[in-house]
């Protein structure tokens, strides 16, 4: 009886282990690569009235690089299993803090992108939403002196937000 019980337990464990699928990801993505193999990332045009020239290419390249570095998805020009598209809708600066003399002490720079995400294999995950990133700098500095650094910082934050919403699903 002990031997039959042991064999039954062993067969049950084997059946459970082969029926269960465990997937570990150390990069934050939550992708079933047996179903999702490709991603299509369109260029995001700038639709903002205020523009900094390098912002568009910087954003588009960083977004593609983010997916390339953090997933095994193959980037394609069309018919991707996942599709990420949208536009840069806002880039602006506004006074943030006031000094004791009544003048602006800090300026906030913000960037907003509208994203349309399509999962052709699981349409219930499709969405369209806006993501915003901000950065603050002292008014004693000129925008031209800090713009590249701040836009790069905001682009990284936006790419993280988009990645998390699309494939990490946090």
Q: What is the predicted role of each segment?
A:
Residues 45-52, 141-149:
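Second-shell loop/turn segments in exported
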Residues 147-170:
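Compositionally biased, intrinsically disordered linkers/stalks adjacent to structured regions
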Residues 1-20:
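Sec-dependent bacterial lipoprotein signal peptides
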Residues 27, 69-74, 78-126, 134-145, ...:
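Surface-exposed short loop/turn segments
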Residues 16-61, 65, 72, 164-170:
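A structural "domain/chain start" motif
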Residues 60, 64-68, 114, 159:
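Generic solvent-exposed, charged/amphipathic alpha-helical segments
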């Amino acid at each position: 009886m002990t031997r039959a019980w042991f064999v039954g337990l062993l067969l049950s464990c084997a059946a459970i282990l082969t029926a269960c699928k465990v997937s570990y990801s150390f990069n934050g993505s939550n992708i079933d690569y047996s179903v999702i193999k490709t991603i299509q990332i369109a260029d995001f045009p700038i639709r903002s009235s205020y523009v900094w020239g390098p912002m568009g290419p910087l954003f588009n390249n960083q977004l593609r690089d983010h997916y390339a570095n953090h997933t095994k998805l193959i980037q394609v020009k069309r018919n991707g299993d996942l599709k990420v598209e949208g536009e840069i809708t806002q880039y602006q600066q506004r006074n943030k803090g006031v000094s004791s003399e009544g003048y602006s002490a800090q300026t906030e720079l913000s960037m907003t992108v509208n994203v349309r995400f399509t999962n052709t294999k699981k349409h219930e995950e499709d969405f369209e939403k806006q993501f915003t990133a901000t950065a603050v700098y002292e008014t004693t500095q000129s925008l031209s002196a800090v713009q590249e650094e701040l836009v790069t910082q905001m682009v990284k934050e936006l790419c993280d937000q988009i990645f998390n919403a699309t494939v990490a699903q946090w």
